[in-house]
Structure formats: C-alpha cells, structure tokens
C-alpha cells in the first residue's frame, strides 16, 4: 500500500490495531534487557551511588521523561508503517501506541545509562569556570548550526526519495531539530567544556548499545523491514541503527550539558552576587538560559587558577570536593587554594625573614578583607610582585562573612610554628604531646573548622545550640587527620620533613622516647631516627587514640552527611578536606 507515494509494499505483515494486550507472551526482548542493559545500569549505579546528588537525580528524571515523550510518536509511526517489526512471540504483550513495553523501557534505560556515564566523567568539573559570554565564538555557533541544518535537509531529501532511504531520513528529520535547539541554547558552555568527558559519555554507551542491539537483531528479537534500509552493516549492525544510537546518545548528553549550563549560570550568579539566593533549583537555573548573564572574565580566571592549583598540588582535596555542589564547593576551592598559596610562599621562602614577611602580609590582607577595606597598594617587582598578587587574589575571593577571622589567625599561628622547623635551631619546636596537639589544632584543626563554617552557612542547622559542639568536633577531626599514621611509619604532622628531605637537610624532628637526645642534622630520609621512637610512641599513645575516636564519632561528619545529601562515603571526602597542608 502506498503511503504518501514514498513506500511500496512495506507491510510485510498485518499490523494489529492499537491495544495494550497482544497474543502469546514471550520474554525474548525482556531477556535482552536482563543480559545487556539492566546489568550495565546496575553497575553504573553502584559505582556512582556515593556521588549521587539531588541535582543528578533531577537531571536524569527530566531527561528520561523527555526521551520517552519525544520518542513515542516517532517510534509508533515506525511500527505502524511496518518499518520496524516484532515477532508476536518475542515480546511480553503490553503495548503503548503499538510500541512494546520493552521498547518503552529501553528508551528509559538507555537514557539512564548514558546520563550516569556523563555524570561519572564530568563529576570533577567545576561548572562556572567554563562559562563564557554568549557573544563569543559566534562563528563556531553558526558553522555547527549550518551543518545540522544541512543534515536535516538531507533527511528531508531521503524521505522524499523514499524506499531504501526512508529509515535514514526519518532518523535525521527526528533528531536534527532537537540537536539544533540544544546546540543553540548551550553552545557558549559546550564549546568550552573539555572534549574528552563529553565524547566519552557519548561513545561508551553507544558502543555498548551497538553490541547489544546487534545481538538482539541477530536472534530475531526485532527487525527492520527490507526496502526501507540501505542494507549496509557495521559489524553486523544496520547502518541506520548505528546512527540511531549515536544521535540519541548525543541528544541525551547535550540535554545534560544544557542542564549543567543552567546550573553553572545560577552558581555564577551566586558567586558574583553574594546577596542572591544560595539555593539552586533547576527551575530557577533554566530561567537564566532565557536571559544570558554578563560574564566577568576576571572572576572566571580566578576560579580557574584556583582549580588548576588544587589539581596540581592537592588532587585529593579537589577530587573530594566533587561530593559538594554549587556555591559551597566553589567557596571550599577558594579556601583551600588560599591555604595552598600561603603554604607555598612559606615553603619557597629563601630565608626565615622572607617567610615572616609573607605571614605578616597575609595577616594584613586578611584584616583588610574582614573590615571591608580596600587593600593598600604595595608595588613589588619581579617574582615578589607576582607572589604578592597571587596572595592578594587568593584572599580577595574568600567569603569573609562566612568565616571567622579568629580561625585565620590560628592558621597563621600554625605557619609561624612551621618557621621554627629549622635545622639550625638547637631546640625542636614540638617537645610534648601538648605541643603536638596545639600544632595540629592550628593547622588541620583550623581547616576543619573553616570547612564547617562554610557548610553551616550554606546548609544551615536547626539547633543553634549544637553549633559549638559541632565546631569542636570539626577541629578534633582535623587534628586526628593531622596526626594519623602514614604508611612509612611516620605521621602527617611535621610536613617540613618532605621539604627538608628534598633539600638533603632532613634532620631529626622527634626526640627519643626518653626525651634526652635529639637527632643530628643531616640524617637521611631512610634513617629510622628521622621520626624516632617518640613519634611511634606518640602515635600509639592515648592522645592519638582519643583524637581518632573523636574523628570516627564526630557529629560534624553526621552533620555534613545529612545536609549534603550524600552517603557515609562522604567520610572519604572529609578526610581529604581536613588533611594536613602538604
């Protein structure tokens, strides 16, 4: 029977009228899901479960809904036109618009698999750093749009030609308008994203589904009727089917990119306008797509530098921060970036005098920031000028209203103790467990408190009377991480050990168990005396046991897990966040 003059005798079998029940049920198509798609989805879910956020669930649910609604009419037309056919004994029997329920389930699970793959590979990305003005790269925008329009025109031509070009034309005419809309909406963000995570998120699910579909077609679960396809195969799979999986996964990934673009705009708005609402919802975020924001290039540059700094020098903290989201994650990145900048200035100082200069300058800049005073103009040249600008910039992006000036003061006291780790001094600065506890409190303990203060600001707390106890738990947790045993038999405190070792100046940081003898300068890195008997004694002592006990049972951990909507695996992240300043 002719249909619009384009198909001739395609109806190989009579297609029954629309109904929800068909004759004898079989589970061949369902078994294909049990073999290929459900195991893949389950494995990805288990892998990504500790990192699931409300934003992820929202994006995936919306994409699945859109995928089903967008595909149902198109797929129903293919089946009613007998381009796709299913043996009656290959499906369970339930149908929606003549589409077997197994096929409808496939739309959902394909979207779910591709979405999870995208979430896994893009989890470390800090979304606002890829924002650019919508006026940039307009040439790229129009070139890609022209290519998509050309493909859509080619699909229309295929439909007009009919016969063996029919299925190919239907795929292009269905997919290209959606791809064009997605590209025009999100091109400023998409063109700046790293290409590897995006391409991988498309290719891996596509390859998996190519294999699964070729096996399903090989067993006769379903087929494309002769006369509607090109009869060109790629590894046993029809060319049109390979193209379908490729473009459908592209639509899913571009849809997720569009959601991330909207989230990135709202995160940027919160970053550039601190008075704006800190709670991010997809509805609020999507509204920003209709009114592009002016992008401050200097702010994006500062965020990018902070991210690159952590990627290079504090990889564990950067990866761990991915469990947080939105403005909280950005504030944590700026906070830890400041710690890294200050730590590097102290470690790389040529002498103690220069190191003390940076501590004094840092204290002055922090005080000015907390008093909302403009930073005084100091003109330095050469390397010192670059270092001063790096310090000034790292402090200028800290959120002073969320953080206590006393905490920063304690952190600077920890840096001042670091200056006493000098092989030329007669006395080692840590002479007792009390000194060790105090040093750990000034360094990692303070970082734990700062992290808690940021979390409290962004997430809030119902019982204000619990806040002091939670802050103490945060500090104890930081101290426990500072003093935790390491694989080399040492401890994380005494971070100068690695620096001195690199200079060939490693000296005995620890007194002996009796406290009567100090190791001489020049001990090698391998020297057992480098950490001495007292270090081992302290690590086995009651003080460390108590600190670790506080860490394990800290209500602070429970608080963060509860308010960040994450699982108990957040402990891994927290360990990275309050880890010593390496």
From Swiss-Prot:
Residues 268-582 are annotated as: Phytoene synthase. Its EC number is 5.5.1.19, 2.5.1.32. Residues 1-261 are annotated as: Lycopene beta-cyclase. It catalyses: all-trans-lycopene = gamma-carotene; gamma-carotene = all-trans-beta-carotene; 2 (2E,6E,10E)-geranylgeranyl diphosphate = 15-cis-phytoene + 2 diphosphate. It is found in: Membrane. It comes from the Eukaryota. InterPro entries: Isoprenoid_synthase_dom_sf, Lycopene_cyclase_dom, Squ/phyt_synthse. It is a multi-pass membrane protein. GO terms for biological process: carotenoid biosynthetic process. In the N-terminal section; belongs to the lycopene beta-cyclase family. In the C-terminal section; belongs to the phytoene/squalene synthase family. This is Bifunctional lycopene cyclase/phytoene synthase. It comes from Aspergillus niger (strain ATCC MYA-4892 / CBS 513.88 / FGSC A1513).
